[in-house]
Amino acid sequence: MATLALSWCLPLLILLLPLATSSASAAVNGTSRFTCFYNSRANISCVWSQDGALQDTSCQVHAWPDRRRWNQTCELLPVSQASWACNLILGTPDSQKLTAVDIVTLRVMCREGVRWRMMAIQDFKPFENLRLMAPISLQVVHVETHRCNISWKISQASHYFERHLEFEARTLSPGHTWEEAPLMTLKQKQEWICLETLTPDTQYEFQVRVKPLQGEFTTWSPWSQPLAFRTKPAALGKDTIPWLGHLLVGLSGAFGFIILVYLLINCRNTGPWLKKVLKCHTPDPSKFFSQLTSEHGGDVQKWLSSPFPSSSFSPGGLAPEISPLEVLERDKVTQLLLQQDKVPEPSSLSSNRSLTSCFTNQGYFFFHLPDALEIEACQVYFTYDPCAEEEPDEGGADAPTGSSPQPLRPLSAEDDAYCTFPSGDDLLLFSPSLLGGPSPPSTAPGGSGAGEERLPPSLQERVPRDWDPQPLGPPTPGVPDLVDFQPRPELVLREAGEQVPDPGPREPFSFPWARPPGQGEVRALNARLPLNTDAYLSLQELQDQDPTHLV
C-alpha cells in the first residue's frame, strides 16, 4: 500500500514543481524601482525598491562609466521593508569625477545561490539627475525681538553651476509640525535669510535645502539639520507690534492729504486765502521800471514790445530794379537782335542827354550752352541805374539843325577789357574769344591794320555801300564815365553825339547797325576792343577800372 501511495504522489509532485518554481521567480522578479542621483562631485546615491520581499538575499549596485576606466560597487542596505539604498563613492568628497558628457551604466545584482542575477539596469546621466548634499553650518548671525538673521553653507557643489542655485527654507513655530510650516523660496544663490514678524521670547527651529537649476530630473537636496534659536524678550513699555504704529501713521497721512485736496478744490475763496497763507515777498517791478507803470499801465507785453510801428520796418523806397538774365540758344540771338533794331527809337531829348550802358557777365552763361565751357552755374543779381551824360549844346552857324550830340570819347584800354562786341557772324551772348582765343589788338583808326567786321546778309542789305563811319573824336572834357555796371549778356552800343559827314564811295561800312542819312543821328560802334577771356568780372575789378565811379 505504501508503494502504491508513493507511486501515485510522484507524478503529482512533478506537476506541482514547475508551478512552485514560477511562483518563486515571480517573487524575485516582481515590480521594482531603481532611482539614482549624483551630488555633482564624487557620490552617486541609489535607492532600489522591490514589491516582493527577498529573504536572505544580498544585492549590490555596480557602476561602469563609458568614458572612464574605473568601476565601483556598493552594497544595498535595507532602509524599509521593501527598499534598499547605497552610496557609490567615486573619489574624495570634493573631486570632480564625472562631467555632463559621461554616461554610467548602473546594474542591481542579487545573489541566488552561487550565481548573481541582474534585477535592474539603467543608463545614468549624472548632470541630468542632480541632488546636492544638504546645506551645513547653519548659525544665527543676529537675533532681535521680532527678527533673526541666519546663514548657512553648501558643500560638495560643482563649479559648473555654483552660481545657478535656489533655496527653500522653513521655520517651525511652537504648536506646529514641519509639514505645516510655510516655505520661503530664494530664487538666487543667497546663503542667508532674515526672518521677520517673529514673536518675542519664542523658541523656533529652522531648516533649509538647495537645488541646482540644471538637469531634467534634478530634485531638492535633503533638508538640513534643524537649527534651534530663541528671540529676545520685548522691553517693558514698548509696543510689541512696531509695524502697527507705522501702518496707522501712513493711513492718517493719506486721509489728511485727501481731505486737504478736497477742500482746496471745492472752496470758492481758496485764491485769496491761499495767497495769505502762502504769502511770500515778491518785489514790485514798478520800483525798478518806472516806464512800465507810467506809460504802459503795468502791461508787461506792451512794455516789452517795440516802440516803433510795424510799418516802419518795411522799406519805404522803391525796390531796386533787378536786371533780367536770359539764356538763349545760338540761332535765336540774331533774330532777337534784328527785331530789337527794327523798333523805332525815340526822338532825341531836347536836353541832349544820352543813356549808355555796357554789361558783361560771360561766365554766368557757361552752363549748358552750345560750344561753352562746363563750369558750375550761380545766380547773379546786380542793380544799376542808367548812365546819364549831359553834354553842352553847341550853338553857332556851323551847328546843324537838330542839335546833334557831341561825339563820345574813346574808351580806354581798361574799359575795353570789360565792354566787348563780337563779330557780326558770331553774335553770341559771350565773347567768342573764349573759344578761339583773344584777337590781336586793333591799330590806329584808319590804318590798314584795322580789322574789318562783316555784317550778316540781312544787315548788309540795309546799309548803304557808300557809307563809312568817321573816327571817333577826342574825349570831351567833363563827360562822366559809366556809373553803374551789371553783368549782362547783351551787346549794347553807346549812342554817340557826333555829326557824320558824307561817307566815301568805296570804303566798306563796318557798323552792324546804321541809320540812313537825314535822321540827324548815327549809332556808332566803339573801336575794336580786346575780348574778355575771364569767366567772371568781379566788383573790385570794375572799381579798379574807373575809381571815380564806385558801384
UniProtKB/Swiss-Prot annotation:
The lineage of its organism: Eukaryota, Metazoa, Chordata, Craniata, Vertebrata. Glycans are attached at N29, N43, N71, N149. GO terms for molecular function: interleukin-15 receptor activity; interleukin-2 binding; interleukin-2 receptor activity. It comes from Macaca fascicularis. Belongs to the type I cytokine receptor family. Type 4 subfamily. Its main location: membrane. A motif (Box 1 motif) lies at residues 278-286. GO terms for biological process: immunoglobulin mediated immune response; interleukin-15-mediated signaling pathway; interleukin-2-mediated signaling pathway; positive regulation of phagocytosis. This is Interleukin-2 receptor subunit beta. It is a single-pass type I membrane protein. The WSXWS motif appears to be necessary for proper protein folding and thereby efficient intracellular transport and cell-surface receptor binding.
